[in-house]
């Protein structure tokens, strides 16, 4: 089987480095290029010591030179959108782990997939446990009408609430089909997080954390808590590998890893 050639955008970031390390360990995936605004040399040594790959801040140049099948993007929305447009113009499939996109930007990404006849997946979270957490929260939403989401991340995360928290609330509302219950009285509404049709979403940013989320349901005489904890970025890699392998066989736009898992 011919290896899938992959370029990593955001290669010097922590997620980008983890992706490169994983690509080196996978028999059917081949890292062929790296892009980052901090690139200062034309080549980036691979984590396993097997050689080096083209490295530049100029995405178009790297794509032209390496002709990859897939670009993996873990950056920020402000940097990601221009890169997505460039990669789509080069007919490169995309696996996007960046969060913080506006609804308008998501619509543009979907249109880019159609116009350029490529596959694009945007996933707020690649941890399989987190995907299952959202699925379980959806199931609970069918029966329990009061819920809140608390997401906790490291203090360097720029967007809040997290993409996973927003996707969780949206999935819960879609499954329930109506708004969740709101408290009858709130004296300090600004202390209650961001509201999404009755679901309050709270964000915590502290050093020492990585990525954690819990969904708490309440009903008369009981509560249900569904929680996921990510202790290292390694937990995201099986989902990233799955997305890379699937997106080369997919045309169009996919939002969420759950679609590939068929949950």
Swiss-Prot record:
Gene3D superfamilies xrefs: Dihydrodipicolinate Reductase, domain 2, NAD(P)-binding Rossmann-like Domain
Positions of NAD(+) binding: 10-15, 97-99, 123-126
Residues that, per the record, bind (S)-2,3,4,5-tetrahydrodipicolinate: 154, 163-164
Reactions it catalyzes: (S)-2,3,4,5-tetrahydrodipicolinate + NAD(+) + H2O = (2S,4S)-4-hydroxy-2,3,4,5-tetrahydrodipicolinate + NADH + H(+); (S)-2,3,4,5-tetrahydrodipicolinate + NADP(+) + H2O = (2S,4S)-4-hydroxy-2,3,4,5-tetrahydrodipicolinate + NADPH + H(+)
InterPro entries to which the protein is assigned, alphabetical: DapB_C, DapB_N, DapB_N_CS, DHDPR_bac, NAD(P)-bd_dom_sf
Active site, UniProt feature: 153, 157
Function, as annotated: Catalyzes the conversion of 4-hydroxy-tetrahydrodipicolinate (HTPA) to tetrahydrodipicolinate.
Protein name as it appears in the record: 4-hydroxy-tetrahydrodipicolinate reductase
């Amino acid at each position: 089987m011919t290896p899938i050639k992959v370029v990593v955008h955001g290669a010097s970031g922590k997620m980008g480095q983890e992706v490169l390390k994983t690509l080196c360990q996978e028999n059917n995936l081949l890292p062929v290029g790296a892009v980052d605004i901090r690139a200062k040399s034309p080549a980036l040594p691979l984590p396993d010591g097997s050689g080096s790959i083209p490295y530049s801040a100029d995405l178009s140049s790297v794509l032209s030179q390496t002709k990859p099948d897939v670009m993996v993007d873990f950056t920020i929305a402000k940097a990601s959108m221009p890169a997505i447009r460039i990669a789509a113009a080069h007919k490169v499939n995309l696996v996007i782990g960046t969060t913080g996109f506006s609804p308008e930007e998501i619509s543009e990404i979907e249109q880019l997939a159609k116009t350029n006849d490529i596959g694009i997946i945007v996933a707020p979270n690649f941890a399989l446990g987190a995907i299952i957490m959202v699925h379980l929260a959806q199931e609970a939403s069918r029966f329990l009408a009061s819920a809140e989401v608390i997401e906790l991340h490291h203090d360097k995360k720029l967007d809040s609430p997290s993409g996973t928290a927003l996707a969780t609330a949206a999935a819960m509302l879609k499954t329930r089909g109506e708004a969740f219950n709101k408290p009858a009285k709130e004296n300090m509404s600004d202390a209650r997080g961001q509201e999404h049709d009755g679901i309050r979403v709270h964000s915590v940013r502290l050093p020492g954390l990585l990525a954690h989320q819990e969904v708490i349901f309440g009903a008369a005489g009981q509560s249900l808590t569904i929680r996921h904890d990510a202790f290292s970025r390694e937990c995201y890699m099986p989902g990233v590998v799955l997305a890379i392998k699937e997106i080369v066989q997919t045309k169009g736009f996919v939002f969420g890893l759950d679609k590939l898992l068929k949950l």
